[in-house]
């Protein structure tokens, strides 16, 4: 996206950084090289997955998802594979999400692709969660959307000072999927609700402090960490954890820096404890602090339908298993593909680039409980199955 497009987006969001992170999440390619877009290699004691589209921030395609799932299952059964490592090529991104533009373009030409991508991606997310081998995600750089899905459900997630986490889907008429309804409400207090509704980004050690990552390692030591993991001889889960803990303990970058949201957490927990988006908005308005008004401004730019879907998704997901959440999210994904706001969000940000989505409905009060029920209803025989 050119400078002019960036400037237009800056006027729609309250900070360049938040705008840039959403743009990075949404930038997609119009072509892929299926043979090279993901590398699957046996190295030492490990199976290594490299998301290999650095020019496009390692965004996921359906072909990549299929290759990763098939190899994951093979390595899980291979007695010579003791752990699985997933990482992104290049230094900018682990994985900035899924092929959003391709999804929108498939609306009128390839309905099966809309079903297949979400179904197979969610099945992969669940397979990572249930993987019998230690699964280590090196989430250096941008990690959003689909990138979160192929990392956060793994046993170990290693952040660096360059890690950037965000779930900005409400800005384009979607919801934080790939199991967001499971892991977000399980973060401390109401942090996950805040992240889901605002698209707020976490960077560096904050990704670890928030609980997205299990370990923090200085970027300059990340290559050595990988080498030491690969050199292990028939390691147990405990051996792997010991190596990660050793590197974590030696990593001092921003060690004494407070969590970016630390001073606001009590208020976040209060504001986002409300059972409706309308009440959350009222809470922010009544507070009136600069931080509250900043978040209010962001929320008012989001799709009203997406906001309501997301709040209900997290509330229901807080008491569901991951497979149950993914079944729910598959229903939501298919409803969003048939709805207005996702395609309008893609149009405004990626196609016409006017950065002025016209949401329908345009106001929270116009999104009724009946509307929401339609998004969450069962698909019958078409429901996601594992």
Swiss-Prot record:
It holds the Pfam family ECH_2. Residues 1-32 form a transit peptide. Pathway: Amino-acid degradation; L-valine degradation. Its EC number is 3.1.2.4. It catalyses: 3-hydroxy-2-methylpropanoyl-CoA + H2O = 3-hydroxy-2-methylpropanoate + CoA + H(+). It is an enzyme of class 3 (hydrolase). The modification N6-succinyllysine is found at residues 92, 221, 250, 257, 297, 301, 353, 377. InterPro entries: ClpP/crotonase-like_dom_sf, ECH_dom, HIBYL-CoA-H. This is 3-hydroxyisobutyryl-CoA hydrolase, mitochondrial. It comes from Bos taurus. The lineage of its organism: Eukaryota, Metazoa, Chordata, Craniata, Vertebrata.
